[in-house]
């Protein structure tokens, strides 16, 4: 990922960030991260619609603080296409995809990326870079390797 996005700040539990928005302290911490950035790559696997909650709070924060051209890149899953096998995980990823589509239709820079059969994480970084640099903005990307 760093090869394609060298200025990326990674936020995860092992470096002190808890993105489960279960209390005001965590929500406020996330809001501060959004206010101090221009792009949020929404890739955390948090059950109970955690990615959807992160997308909604990023959107609300960008609107409330008038952050122009804020971008959210949502990382989907091929589980979106197999609800029989992946059940709730498929439902959560499809909810994320649909909400991203709704926000994009309002003019908010939200993109949903689904990459199948990926052997190397670097493919995700390359795809995110493509979305960020593409004009017009790509609100939905599906790639099969």
Language-model-detected regions and their locations in the chain:
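Canonical Rossmann dinucleotide-binding motif of NAD(H)/NADP(H)-dependent dehydrogenases/reductases
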Residues: 1-11
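Rossmann-fold cofactor-recognition segment
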Residues: 10-28, 40-41, 45-46
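Conserved amphipathic alpha-helix within the SDR
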Residues: 24-35, 57
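Amphipathic alpha-helical dimer-interface segment in Rossmann-like NAD(P)H-dependent oxidoreductases
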Residues: 32, 45-70, 105
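Structural motif
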Residues: 38-39, 71
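Conserved NAD(P)H cofactor-binding loop of Rossmann-fold oxidoreductase domains
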Residues: 39-50, 76-79
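C-terminal helical subdomain
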Residues: 118-145
């Amino acid at each position: 990922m760093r090869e394609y996005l060298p200025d990326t700040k990674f936020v995860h539990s092992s470096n002190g960030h808890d993105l489960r928005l279960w209390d005001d302290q965590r929500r406020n911490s996330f809001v501060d991260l959004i206010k101090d950035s221009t792009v949020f790559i929404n890739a955390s696997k948090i059950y109970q619609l955690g990615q959807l909650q992160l997308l909604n709070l990023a959107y609300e924060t960008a609107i409330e603080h008038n952050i122009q051209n804020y971008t959210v890149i949502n990382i989907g899953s091929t589980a979106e296409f197999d609800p029989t096998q992946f059940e709730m995980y498929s439902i959560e990823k499809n909810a994320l995809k649909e909400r991203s589509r709704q926000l994009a239709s309002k003019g908010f820079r939200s993109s949903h990326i689904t990459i199948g059969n990926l052997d190397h994480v670097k493919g995700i970084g390359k795809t995110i870079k493509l979305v960020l640099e593409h004009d017009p903005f790509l609100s939905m990307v599906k790639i099969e390797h």
